[in-house]
Curated annotation (Swiss-Prot):
GO cellular component, one term: mitochondrial membrane
Residue stretches spanning the membrane: 1-21, 24-44
Membrane topology (UniProt): Multi-pass membrane protein
EC number: 7.1.1.2
Location in the cell: Mitochondrion membrane
UniProt KW keywords: Electron transport, Membrane, Mitochondrion, NAD, Respiratory chain, Translocase, Transmembrane, Transmembrane helix, Transport, Ubiquinone
GO molecular function: NADH dehydrogenase (ubiquinone) activity
Major subcellular site: mitochondrion
Protein name in the entry: NADH-ubiquinone oxidoreductase chain 6
Organism whose genome encodes this protein: Artemia salina
Length: 56
């Protein structure tokens, strides 16, 4: 999961450096879609990981 977030960060920096002369603004609607998606995916991955781990 951390590798995925690192890749997203690298792509964001790369795209923002390509369009350095233009204003790069994140609108609120896309932000409102991205944050819950990341949180839900983290919860789903965490729940699957808890079910796969052996209980002792």
């Amino acid at each position: 999961f951390l590798i995925f977030l690192g890749g997203i960060l690298v792509m964001f920096i790369y795209v923002s450096s390509l369009s350095a002369n233009e204003k790069f603004a994140v609108d609120l609607t896309s932000f409102m879609w991205v944050v819950p998606t990341i949180v839900l995916s983290f919860l789903v991955l965490n729940k699957n990981f808890m079910f796969m781990s052996p209980s002792s």
